[in-house]
């Protein structure tokens, strides 16, 4: 059975690929789940258009990610004032990815989604300088140092 994939399928192909599979696999698995459509000339044209638009979007996303990376690198580091427990340097709570994003925006950086921020540990729980990695695109990531300082 000849099919055109509408979703990425492991060990078979990616969106827009024309593949030859056994009838049962196509009829009972791929077609009911919407992962493929039966190959025809019209369907092939539609799949080619979808593939071209995705490639164009991927290039735009990569360019946008590079712009954000440049803006974040221009910041160098970001200060994040927090309340501390006495003089020990431990925090009353913890610094999360959302707090880091808010500090970047407050410092004049771009507005980011907190899901792209990767902390070395789940939360920052002490005063000091901590590295933070942001995954802007599958191919692009940027590192920023966050200075957690005691609020006065």
Swiss-Prot record:
<dbReference type="GO" id="GO:0006412">
    <property type="term" value="P:translation"/>
</dbReference>
<comment type="similarity">
    <text>Belongs to the bacterial ribosomal protein bL9 family.</text>
</comment>
<protein>
    <recommendedName>
        <fullName>Large ribosomal subunit protein bL9</fullName>
    </recommendedName>
</protein>
<dbReference type="GO" id="GO:1990904">
    <property type="term" value="C:ribonucleoprotein complex"/>
</dbReference>
<dbReference type="GO" id="GO:0019843">
    <property type="term" value="F:rRNA binding"/>
</dbReference>
<dbReference type="GO" id="GO:0003735">
    <property type="term" value="F:structural constituent of ribosome"/>
</dbReference>
<dbReference type="InterPro" id="IPR020070">
    <property type="entry name" value="Ribosomal_bL9_N"/>
</dbReference>
<dbReference type="GO" id="GO:0005840">
    <property type="term" value="C:ribosome"/>
</dbReference>
<dbReference type="InterPro" id="IPR020069">
    <property type="entry name" value="Ribosomal_bL9_C"/>
</dbReference>
<keyword id="KW-0694">RNA-binding</keyword>
<dbReference type="InterPro" id="IPR020594">
    <property type="entry name" value="Ribosomal_bL9_bac/chp"/>
</dbReference>
<keyword id="KW-0687">Ribonucleoprotein</keyword>
<dbReference type="Pfam" id="PF03948">
    <property type="entry name" value="Ribosomal_L9_C"/>
</dbReference>
<dbReference type="InterPro" id="IPR036935">
    <property type="entry name" value="Ribosomal_bL9_N_sf"/>
</dbReference>
<dbReference type="InterPro" id="IPR036791">
    <property type="entry name" value="Ribosomal_bL9_C_sf"/>
</dbReference>
<dbReference type="InterPro" id="IPR009027">
    <property type="entry name" value="Ribosomal_bL9/RNase_H1_N"/>
</dbReference>
<dbReference type="Pfam" id="PF01281">
    <property type="entry name" value="Ribosomal_L9_N"/>
</dbReference>
<keyword id="KW-0689">Ribosomal protein</keyword>
<dbReference type="InterPro" id="IPR000244">
    <property type="entry name" value="Ribosomal_bL9"/>
</dbReference>
<keyword id="KW-0699">rRNA-binding</keyword>
<comment type="function">
    <text>Binds to the 23S rRNA.</text>
</comment>
């Amino acid at each position: 059975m000849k099919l055109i994939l509408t979703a990425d399928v492991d060990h078979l192909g990616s969106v827009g690929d024309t593949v030859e599979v056994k009838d049962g696999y196509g009829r009972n698995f791929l077609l009911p789940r919407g992962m493929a459509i039966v190959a025809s000339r019209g369907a092939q044209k539609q799949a080619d258009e979808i593939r071209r638009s995705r490639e164009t979007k991927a290039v735009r996303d990569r360019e946008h990610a590079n712009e954000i990376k440049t803006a974040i690198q221009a910041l160098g580091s970001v200060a994040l004032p927090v309340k501390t427990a006495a003089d020990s340097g431990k925090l009353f709570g913890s610094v999360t990815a959302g707090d880091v994003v808010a500090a970047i925006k407050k410092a004049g950086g771009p507005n980011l989604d907190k899901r792209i921020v990767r902390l070395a540990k789940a939360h920052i729980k002490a005063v000091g300088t901590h590295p933070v990695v942001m995954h802007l695109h599958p191919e692009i990531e940027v590192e920023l140092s966050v200075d957690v300082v005691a609020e006065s």
